[in-house]
């Protein structure tokens, strides 16, 4: 991830192996990380069972919010790719029982990979 993307807050892919090791204490016994995308300090993590949105809060990032979304609760998703003057992409996911979408900013280069990961987990 380049400095410009970091400053803009655009997510880019990060090492699934490193994230798997970091999240080992909260993963189920038969669960592993398949892909992860970093947004400054926050992470969007795709596992074999769920999507985990990790929000590191505060100045030090010691307070962490883990939003766990089972794939079966995702009813639809939209990936909006970047345009000529728009440098970022966006993922919107809707959950059963919720009217509003959850929005996640992405880098233009990771939009297709995020869409592929979601499609693989939802439709495979």
Show the residue positions of the predicted features.
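Anionic N-terminal interaction surfaces
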Residues: 1-44, 100, 107-109, 124
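Charged, low-complexity, helix/coiled-coil-prone segments
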Residues: 10-23, 52-67, 120-122
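Hydrophobic transmembrane alpha-helix bundles
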Residues: 22, 35, 71-79, 103-105, ...
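Phosphoinositide-binding peripheral membrane targeting modules
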Residues: 27-43, 47-99
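Low-complexity intrinsically disordered segments
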Residues: 92-124
